[in-house]
């Protein structure tokens, strides 16, 4: 006699396919240990499934489950006719797995948010040649206009060879300025705080001396030696205070100047036209003799890649930053769970599960919302 149970229960299994796939579905929403997953299933379905059974089902079926879900997603994407836009975000992140360092390379569409490719490789394989291979292989057969990246030295040559435009992330450009600038600013702030404390202490001593001998005008008689010493001490303290005030003004002026130049550089990237941006940039660079060394060195270095920094001004479809892929990393493999996984397979499975959720929410759902709003 033929039954339909095979659709729901695999041969020689005690639990339905739904129960076996429970951990996969749960893992797309939140992380839970095998013990906690077993407890959730038992509480929800009134069963007595063991931690070991949950583990075995995942090892046996995870890759097949993920492959089926990914195939379904791509089928849906093809049906909705969601195509690659030609604008892509590329980045890498380092992941430590069981004390070994791996590199995750990712390429996502800047407009449709489709994950073009996302892989993990051992750190010793990661080099300029591999980046080129990854991008070339990932973009094969796809429309290619622009690639948005951070400031890695290898990127410009590779992207030029691919025949694409290159946009440097504005956020990362400012980071290269801010790292040395923050040290300088904090150093100046510490000096200013130190001088202000010294000035306050000097003033306290002056006030105390004034309270001891409150002469209104002129010097006290020479016969009053204590009063004369009091006046001399106050005079010395006032001179020291004046010297400190001069230093304070100098450091405050330097700090104010650095912050103003930093804001002017940041403002360059807010303008929409190439002409305005480049004029503002050149005006700053022309002030070589007036600029603090740290600001001039940054501008001089930026001038070598200014075309890549301002590519967005020539095409409004180019994003200014690589923030989307930074968000992608935080969503698909957040820091709070990075140290939990001890095998490459476990990390890859978790990332694939979260990538499926990303595609469902950020690609398919957003496309359907956009279509319904038209």
Residue spans for each PLM region:
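Basic, low-complexity segments
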Residues: 1-13
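Short small-residue beta-strand/loop micro-motif enriched in glycine and branched aliphatics
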Residues: 4, 113-118, 340-341
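RNase H-like nuclease fold core
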Residues: 10-18, 25, 29, 34, ...
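Alpha-helical residues within the helix-turn-helix
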Residues: 39
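Short, polar/flexible loop-turn hinges at active-site or ligand-entry regions and domain interfaces
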Residues: 141-143, 166, 188-193, 342
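Acidic/histidine-rich catalytic cores and adjacent linkers
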Residues: 149-156, 161, 197-374
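Inter-helix linker motif
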Residues: 162-186
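Solenoidal tandem-repeat scaffolds enriched in leucines and small polar residues
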Residues: 183-194, 201
